[in-house]
């Protein structure tokens, strides 16, 4: 079988296991910061961090698709009005050579389009802190959504977002290949509040055989927030029936 597992209890500034695009970096505290904030930045900023090794997500010879589990903790900080702070973060699967695309509410994964574009070959779970119905065809509230080749989610659940280091969120995302079910759950351990979203997603129809996995985040001028990942665990299992 084609298995891959890795675990970051925290992140290292001189680690060699992540690659970065845009504003993503590991900061001194051992936290993966997905975007910068500050005065001398463009209107939309964002970044991507991905695991350096590609993941074999399906096998074109056998048709087998991998199941995977990933879990991570994140928090967000803002000096803006928290209600208006933008834009959120994602966990994604995409081609290993995919570029950093439009930042801000497109999370570096998509361009300025509402159309489903299969050339993106991207599946993401978004933690959208604003939910703009005008720009993104979104529900008009913060939400956790599952995105397939576009920034508009195919399914979304309302999310009462929280800011500050005392509001760490724990996330678990599970893909069950046999049922093609992708489920994302977020829990605030401080009070055990939990929400989850699930969709049927056929990874073989959407993704290339080999993908990269990682995080992206974005924000917008005047309503800036940072999106910071504290730890990350990932494991995938692709059964090779003909081996």
UniProtKB/Swiss-Prot annotation:
Gene3D superfamilies named among the record's database cross-references: 2.60.120.200
GO MF, any single term: metal ion binding
Binding site residues for Ca(2+): 128, 135, 138
Annotated glycosylation sites: 10, 116
PROSITE patterns: LECTIN_LEGUME_ALPHA, LECTIN_LEGUME_BETA
Record's keyword annotation contains Calcium: yes
Superkingdom of source: Eukaryota
Signal sequence range: none
Keyword Calcium appears in the UniProt entry: yes
InterPro entries: ConA-like_dom_sf, L-lectin, Lectin_LegA_CS, Lectin_legB_Mn/Ca_BS, Legume_lectin_dom, Leguminous_Lectin
Pfam families attached to this UniProt entry: Lectin_legB
Binding-site residues, Mn(2+): 126, 128, 138, 143
Keywords: Calcium, Glycoprotein, Lectin, Manganese, Metal-binding
Family, similarity comment: Belongs to the leguminous lectin family.
Purpose: L-fucose specific lectin.
Protein name per its UniProtKB record: Anti-H(O) lectin 1
Organism of origin: Ulex europaeus
């Amino acid at each position: 079988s084609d298995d891959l597992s890795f675990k970051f209890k925290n992140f290292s500034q001189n680690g060699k296991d992540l690659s970065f695009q845009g504003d993503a970096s590991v900061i001194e505290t051992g936290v993966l910061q997905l975007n910068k904030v500050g005065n001398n930045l463009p209107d939309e900023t964002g970044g991507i961090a991905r695991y350096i090794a590609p993941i074999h997500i399906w096998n074109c010879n056998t048709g087998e698709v991998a199941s995977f589990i990933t879990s991570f903790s994140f928090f967000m900080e803002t000096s803006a009005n928290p209600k208006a702070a933008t834009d959120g973060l994602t966990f994604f699967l995409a081609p290993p050579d995919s570029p950093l695309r439009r930042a801000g509410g497109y999370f570096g994964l998509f361009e300025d389009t509402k159309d489903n574009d299969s050339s993106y070959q991207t599946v993401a779970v978004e933690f959208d802190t604003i939910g703009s119905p005008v720009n993104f065809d979104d529900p008009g509230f913060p939400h956790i959504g599952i995105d397939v080749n576009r920034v508009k989610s195919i399914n979304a659940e309302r999310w009462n977002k929280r800011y500050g280091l005392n509001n760490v969120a724990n996330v678990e995302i599970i893909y069950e290949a046999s049922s093609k079910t992708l489920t994302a759950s977020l829990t605030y351990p401080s009070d055990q509040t939990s929400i989850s979203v699930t969709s049927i997603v056929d990874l073989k129809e959407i993704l290339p055989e080999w993908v990269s996995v990682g995080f992206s985040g974005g924000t917008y001028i005047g309503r800036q927030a940072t999106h910071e990942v504290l730890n990350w665990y990932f494991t995938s299992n692709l059964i090779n029936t003909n081996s």
